[in-house]
Design a protein with these regions (language model features):
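Active-site-flanking structural segment that lines cofactor/substrate pockets
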Residues: 26-60
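Buried, small/hydrophobic-residue-enriched core segments of structured protein domains
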Residues: 43-52, 61-64, 70-211
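Low-complexity, highly charged intrinsically disordered N-terminal segments
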Residues: 1-37
Length: 211
């Protein structure tokens, strides 16, 4: 929806075609040329007012083997067969990172379940045993948000707060009423270094942080 409906509506269908064509010719004319998709095709798509595509997918959350396609994109109008590959590239680049994070979380959860069963004497919640602290290592807030949301399919701990809002928006949940994800008051190297500069000695620093 974000890309196939909202983005195309805001930046293509709801923009006057002359403006679309001017920008198209400016960018492609200065880089790879404008013969790939000519003005006639663009105008026909703009006049149509929507993307004539059918997207079919396995049910969300389904784990599939390698070589099993998870989505299939088909055109629904004979004049726009060229559109499929264009959209496939965009969908692929928006999906793979989230899918990898979900798979990593799933694999870690299997390991946690196995060894928690072997070594834990209490009924510790398995979903609270690992957490996501990856936000500062991601390339954007959007990537961090979706990656953490995917990880939260297997674990409930994340320091990526925007992921909680993303999950609420997309999955109709409410963190004030049900477990969605949890954060924690914690510290790490930069916090410890900056606080040490303030306190001047380790004992004072630790005492203040614990209190």
């Amino acid at each position: 929806q974000e890309y196939l409906i909202e983005a195309f509506s805001d930046h293509f269908f709801n923009v006057p075609f002359d403006s679309v064509l001017k920008e198209y010719n400016r960018v492609l004319g200065a880089t790879i040329g404008t013969k790939g998709v000519g003005e006639k095709r663009l105008r026909e798509l703009h006049d149509l007012g929507y993307l004539p595509l059918q997207v079919r997918a396995v049910p969300e959350g389904t784990r599939t083997n390698i070589k099993v396609p998870q989505i299939e994109i088909s055109n629904t109008h004979p004049n726009f067969v060229w559109l499929v590959n264009t959209i496939e590239t965009m969908l692929s680049c928006t999906m793979w990172h989230t899918q990898v994070s979900a798979e990593v979380g799933y694999r870690y959860r299997k390991i946690v379940n196995e060894y928690a069963e072997r070594t834990c004497d209490d009924n510790v919640v398995r979903a609270r045993l690992l957490g996501d602290f990856s936000m500062r290592g991601q390339e954007s807030v959007e990537s961090a948000t979706k990656s953490a949301a995917a990880f939260c399919l297997s674990f409930l701990n994340t320091a990526t707060v925007p992921a909680i809002l993303w999950l609420e928006h997309n999955y109709n949940c409410d963190c004030s009423k049900e477990p969605v994800a949890y954060g924690a008051l914690s510290t790490e190297h930069s916090v410890m270094c900056s606080n040490f500069a303030v306190d001047g000695d380790e004992v004072t620093q630790i005492r203040r942080l614990l209190c």
